[in-house]
């Protein structure tokens, strides 16, 4: 991996070690990407304490004059990507600035070195390595038609662990995410990387229990607890190449 992408802004103390950096090769899978996945998503509105924690992990040029409105957690199994299948967990913060919404990613962890490098070099996403463990069916739960257990996972890295357990409804409905909400990341030189993902698939209502054992820099704002969310299957995601110009989102990122 190009060393300029090793120090991207993200959660302190949950990053890449010098040994990990030296072992990573440069990405050979440039954007855009078209991928197929299965994803479990949930959200919460941050309280005052969580907003203070978000302020500590989102770079000032991104959060200037903006208010965190929503934190979205996602546990994703990528079934098909340019670098092969892999797993990912992430937390996305949706901000509002002057009536406009945008999102940014302070935390993302994967079990694929190639996926890690591509995420950093293509979109300036602060991906870090993690191990994923299948938790199976919750203890004592009856087998029910339509209940999905293969997204019950524990995800861990040095000094942190997140556990997600879920049950889902039985009726899938069409789901579509249009390429409207911009994601704004800062590149290694502070330049804005701006892109608008889109997705379509099928979704089912999910009930989740999310437990976080991590340093305060992650624990205090990650959407933990009992949540209602959605399980997305047969999910087709498009990740376009970012723009790096001073367009609308870039100008907004620089406002003071």
Where are these regions (language model features)?
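Interaction-surface and assembly-scaffold signal
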Residues: 2, 6-16, 20-23, 119-256
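Alpha-helical protein-protein interaction elements
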Residues: 25, 34, 67-70, 78, ...
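Generic structural signal for short, solvent-exposed loop/turn connectors between secondary structure elements
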Residues: 51-52, 58-69, 95-101, 139-141, ...
């Amino acid at each position: 991996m190009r060393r300029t992408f090793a120090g991207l802004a993200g959660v302190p103390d949950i990053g890449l070690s010098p040994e990990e950096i030296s072992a990573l090769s440069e990405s050979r899978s440039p954007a855009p990407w078209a991928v197929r996945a299965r994803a479990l998503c949930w959200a919460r509105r941050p309280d005052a304490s969580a907003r203070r924690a978000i302020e500590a992990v989102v770079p000032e040029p991104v959060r200037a004059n903006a208010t965190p409105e929503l934190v979205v957690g996602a546990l994703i199994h990528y079934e098909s990507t340019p670098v092969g299948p892999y797993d990912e967990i992430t937390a996305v913060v949706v901000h509002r600035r002057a009536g406009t919404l945008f999102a940014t990613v302070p935390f993302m962890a994967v079990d694929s070195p190639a996926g890690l490098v591509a995420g950093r070099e293509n979109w300036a996403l602060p991906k870090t390595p993690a191990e994923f463990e299948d938790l199976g069916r919750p203890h004592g739960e009856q087998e029910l038609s339509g209940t999905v257990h293969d997204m019950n996972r524990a995800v861990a890295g040095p000094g942190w662990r997140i556990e997600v357990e879920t049950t889902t409804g039985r009726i899938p409905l069409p789901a579509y995410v249009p390429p409207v909400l911009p994601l704004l990341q800062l590149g290694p030189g502070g330049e804005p990387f701006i892109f608008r993902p889109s997705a379509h698939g099928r979704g089912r209502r999910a009930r989740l229990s999310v437990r976080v054992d991590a340093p305060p820099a992650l624990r205090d704002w990650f959407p933990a607890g009992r949540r209602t969310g959605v399980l997305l299957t047969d999910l087709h995601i498009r990740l376009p190449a970012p723009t790096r110009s001073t367009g609308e989102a870039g100008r907004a990122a620089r406002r003071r």
